[in-house]
């Protein structure tokens, strides 16, 4: 949602946020990235069932899932503010962050991508329970404080 909204704001010549923070973003509702297969059995939240991806139908409705405001991976990244992507290495959504970060860099954006090893979807919500979660929030604070 963060990327889709930023693209929309830019396209409407509206003010953009100064920075974008994305935690395990779902940027490709077509599920075409390699991690959808590679992490199929590793992802404790989405893995081992395609039914877990059912939300894409509710979100996209009858719209083409490749529309940039639905799947920002297929959009234009030019002119977007600095962005931080955080993602776990076990996520089916890993390639969504990796590919979006790559595309943003190619468009000249200031991009930070951090892949947290052996972490799952939105591990950041574990707050003080996991060292990786604490590190992720510290990274967000440092990124926003720049």
Where are these regions (language model features)?
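Alpha/beta-hydrolase superfamily serine-hydrolase fold, recognizing
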Residues: 1-146
């Amino acid at each position: 949602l963060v990327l889709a909204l930023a693209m929309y704001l830019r396209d409407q010549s509206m003010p953009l946020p100064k920075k974008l923070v994305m935690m395990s973003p779902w940027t490709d509702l077509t599920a075409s990235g390699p991690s959808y297969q590679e992490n199929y059995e590793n992802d404790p939240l989405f893995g081992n069932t395609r039914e877990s991806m059912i939300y894409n139908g509710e979100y996209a409705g009858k719209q083409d899932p490749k529309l940039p405001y639905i799947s920002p991976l297929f959009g234009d990244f030019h002119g977007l503010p600095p962005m931080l992507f955080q993602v776990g290495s076990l996520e089916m959504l890993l390639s969504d962050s990796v590919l979006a970060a790559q595309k943003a860099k190619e468009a000249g954006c200031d991009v930070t991508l951090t892949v947290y090893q052996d972490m799952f979807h939105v591990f950041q919500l574990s707050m003080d329970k996991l060292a990786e979660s604490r590190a992720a929030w510290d990274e967000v604070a440092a990124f926003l404080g720049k």
